[in-house]
Structures are given as C-alpha cells and as structure tokens.
Amino acid sequence: MKQSKMLIPTLREMPSDAQVISHALMVRAGYVRQVSAGIYAYLPLANRTIEKFKTIMRQEFEKIGAVEMLAPALLTADLWRESGRYETYGEDLYKLKNRDQSDFILGPTHEETFTTLVRDAVKSYKQLPLNLYQIQSKYRDEKRPRNGLLRTREFIMKDGYSFHKDYEDLDVTYEDYRKAYEAIFTRAGLDFKGIIGDGGAMGGKDSQEFMAVTPNRTDLNRWLVLDKTIPSIDDIPEDVLEEIKVELSAWLVSGEDTIAYSTESSYAANLEMATNEYKPSTKAATFEEVTKVETPNCKSIDEVAGFLSIDENQTIKTLLFIADEQPVVALLVGNDQVNDVKLKNYLAADFLEPASEEQAKEIFGAGFGSLGPVNLPDSVKIIADRKVQDLANAVSGANQDGYHFTGVNPERDFTAEYVDIREVKEGEISPDGKGTLKFARGIEIGHIFKLGTRYSDSMGANILDENGRSNPIVMGCYGIGVSRILSAVIEQHARLFVNKTPKGAYRFAWGINFPEELAPFDVHLITVNVKDQESQDLTEKIEADLMLKGYEVLTDDRNERVGSKFSDSDLIGLPIRVTVGKKASEGIVEVKIKASGDTIEVHADNLIETLEILTKK
C-alpha cells in the first residue's frame, strides 16, 4: 500500500487536550480523529488494527463453538421495560422516539435482544447449549467523555451470550471463554490480568474482569528505545535523563480501575472486590461500661483518637447510607474506608448512596462525626466490617454532637451483620495467605459474567427439561471492548525513541511499537529519495518480494524530507522498517527492528531471509 494514497494525517506536536499517552499518540500518529465529544472516526490505520483484532477474536471463538451474528443497534424500549432496565439503567441510556412517538433506545448492551431471540426460537433443552456473539457499535451517553477511546459515547464491542439447560453446562462455557480471552489478549501482545470483578448493572452472579495493566513511568529500560548511536542508557547524560523523566511523568497513568494482586500467587481482583486475609483477634478479658464523654470539636477519627489518647484502631467509624430508600449503617474500624460495591452487593440493593447530614440528624439526632451504633432504632439495619467484631472497649459516636461513648462492645451494646465491607490496603496479606497485596492501574478490556436466570426470569425465556418441566434458561454473558483495545495496546507499547545527532545533541520523541499481530502493516518500506530511479526500482522490487512472502507493506513514496519520514515511521509504529537510501545502487538497504532499535544493513536479495531470522529471534 502506497502511503501517498492513505489517509494518515500525522501531527508535528502532541494534541494539547490529551492527558494520557495513548490518546495523544493515536491522534498524533493519524489513527483517529474526534468528530464530536466522545465520538471518534477510525482512520485507515486504526481500522486495520481493529480488523486484525477482530480476526484474532473470530479465530479463538471458533475453537469454542461460538457463532457470530448481528443484532440491531436500534432497540425498542419495550424489551428493556420487560427486563426492568429501562428505568434503572440510568442517564447513560440513549432514549429516542420515532415519528409515531414510540420509544426506542440505542443499545449499550444486548442481553434483552438475545434473550428474546432465543426465547422465541428455543423450547427444549435438546436445543441447548447455544453460544452466540456479535461485534457491533454500542452507545452510552457518558456525562464526561475523556481519555480518547477509553471513555466514549460510541464504541465498538464484542458481546457474546450463551444459553444453557443448567449451571453445570454454563460452567463449561464460562471456562471456555476464560481460556479464549486469555489466548486473545496474549496474541494481542497485552500485559493483562484476569481478576475477580463486579457484575454491576449486568446482574447475575460470578464474574471475571480482564484488565490491561498500565505501566508505571519509572522504568526507563521499559520506555526507552535507543538509536544505534547510543550504546546504553548509562551513556545518556544525567541532564538529558532528567528531561526524559519529566516527559514521562507529564502523562497521566491511564486506567479507570485499581487492581489489587498478590506478589506470590495468582490472586488478583478489582479494588472494588478485593479482600485480604482475615484472622479473628482475641478480645479483652474484661468489658468496661459504656461511658459518655465530651469530645468538643472532634469529628474525624484522628481528632477523636488524639483527644482521648487512644489508637485510631480502637475507634468505630459509623457511616450512614440510603439503600433502596432505606437507611443502612456501615461500621468500620478506625480509618478503614468503606467499599461501596461490597456493601451494595451484600445488601443486593439496586441503589446505594451516602446519606446527607440532614438525613443523619433525622435518624441519629446528631451530625457527621458524632454518629454511633449504640441505642439505634430497630428499624435501622447495621452492617459491620468483620474487623469490628474483634474490638473490645471501643470508642464510637454517642449520637449527640460533641460527645462519644467509650467502653463500647459489639454484641453487648449493638447487634450487627458482620461481613467484609472495607477497602483493602496495599501491603496487606493476600486472602490466600500467599504474599502481600500490590496495587496497579488497569484498563478493563474484557468481562465475563454468569448471568444465571436474571434475564430469562424477567422475560419468560423457559425450556422444557428432560422431565417435561418448564425451567428458565441459564445464561452467560461475555464482553470485549474492541475499540478500547487500541488504547490499551498503545498505552503499553508507547515508547520514547532516543537518538544522538552527528553534533552530539540528544533528541527524544514519542512513538509506538505495535505488537506484530495488531500492527496495521508488517513492514514500513521507506524510500529516502523518491526522485532517484535506482531507489524507486529497488523499492518496487522489495515491495513485490515482501508481498509475495505474505508481508503487508506500507511504502512511503511521499516526496518528503527523510527526517519527516522517519519521525512518521516512529509514530505509526510498524514492527519492521526497511530503508532504501544512499546504497540503493549497490542493492543495500537498512533494516530496523522497532521493538529493540537494532539495525542492520543487508543486500536486498537476502532481505527476506534476514527478516525471518530477525523476527524469529
């Protein structure tokens, strides 16, 4: 493919509105352009990469018996009313009316549609299992689109749905998808973790998220690609290294989620779902009496602990939430933070939000900072973190502004349901007892769910079993964020290319090193002087030879300065660069392997053999 015929609008500078490196590079390198807030056009390079990723998915899904189809993006609201999600999904749902004033939506996901199609076609367990998927644009009216393709209003997604006679059958397909996802993301060249996740608005029970780990900005060996003029990082002057570090730190570490993972085992979970090892501790032998003490101007845990000269872990933090319009008290030890997702999941609540101070005063008779679990009305449900039950003679709010209780003991002074509702901290013991927890930022690229009968129950999708009894179909759901894969790959494969000029000055600039299976082309073939006939003839011969061997070639035939061509080549990020330059008359070309920065001169007749050796290496 001739570069002069492609739409690749590279920019000389990074876009000023980009905060993460993936967004900046995909715009600067000419992969995407924003059409309006949260809506992007995928230009030829991006489209080729996305199509290659689709090919990987199709190959892996065929291995597990998944069948591709296509459902409409424009959906009748009646289906979503039937499932109950039309009212509960929230403001992200695009709602519209046709000329007859009938309600429609633009699909953000397709559980209802697939459930209806199978409900109307499948009547017996003998017709199951079914494993269907589609690759399609989805729509969500994001309040604040940001970070390029990571948070958009229109996005490309692979969503799959499986239908089963029972949970044992679902378990088999769920495991098939887990392995398929691992194969897909490995082939895509991604550093990822499969982690325990939250089902969120999808409903259902078990779920696993797949997160692309966002690299930190401190490992220079990971970020820098050195030109052949620079032997090692140690040869770069200290002042230049400082400039490089400043440039690296200028970009936000991307990823909407925090991953908690073990340093010594396979345990990994979204921070929303992460837990730690818990071992009950021994309580004090004697219990003190509850005593009300004055604590003027003490509202935070630190202020109360300091005023009473006690350890903060001897205090009970009391928080008030409204869950489905009912008050719920959450108790934690000291400065532990509540994990809203754990609390919401335990309550099986559709809506959970922190109460206002006015609501707190109405229920407790006191404002924030003086709340406590003692003497609460029976109508108020108390959920306590499991660590709270180990406390003895603790301090809590007295439900009177400016006062606290000492000598508070769980069970004797209040009754609660004990469950893990705290947010874990880095350095705590992994729940399997192996290693400690470390945190990393991550980009969600895939999610698999065991939906169970959440949608078949509400939409009447039933089958007759072996005994002729009617049972709801058991479902699974499997999603991959196709367009955000491009962001995740660039986030992990962005590099700073460093070179030294003939005069000894150091230069560095951003570019991409695409993994082989996702690169829009395999080889970037650059002609230094397009006006030189020998160079042109050699370029055409090399292009033909490479294509004959199955290489996809982007030939830079533009009449541009060589520096501009090399700069664009680094930005575009193809794995191999072949340069036809000054030695074209001798049949000599330069080969550069982008991932390592290694370069070698070879005769054009030996190019194919050399590439096979270098790429295998």
Swiss-Prot record:
Localization terms from the record: Cytoplasm
PROSITE patterns for the chain: AA_TRNA_LIGASE_II
EC number: 6.1.1.15
UniProt cross-references to CDD domains, sorted A to Z: ProRS-INS, ProRS_anticodon_short
One family name in Pfam for this protein: HGTP_anticodon
Keyword Nucleotide-binding: yes
GO biological process, one term: prolyl-tRNA aminoacylation
Alphabetic keyword roster: Aminoacyl-tRNA synthetase, ATP-binding, Cytoplasm, Ligase, Nucleotide-binding, Protein biosynthesis
Main location: cytoplasm
Keyword flag NADP: no
GO CC aspect terms: cytosol
Function, in words: Catalyzes the attachment of proline to tRNA(Pro) in a two-step reaction: proline is first activated by ATP to form Pro-AMP and then transferred to the acceptor end of tRNA(Pro). As ProRS can inadvertently accommodate and process non-cognate amino acids such as alanine and cysteine, to avoid such errors it has two additional distinct editing activities against alanine. One activity is designated as 'pretransfer' editing and involves the tRNA(Pro)-independent hydrolysis of activated Ala-AMP.
Domain notes for this protein: Consists of three domains: the N-terminal catalytic domain, the editing domain and the C-terminal anticodon-binding domain.
Family: Belongs to the class-II aminoacyl-tRNA synthetase family. ProS type 1 subfamily.
Protein name (database record): Proline--tRNA ligase
Gene, per the UniProt record: proS
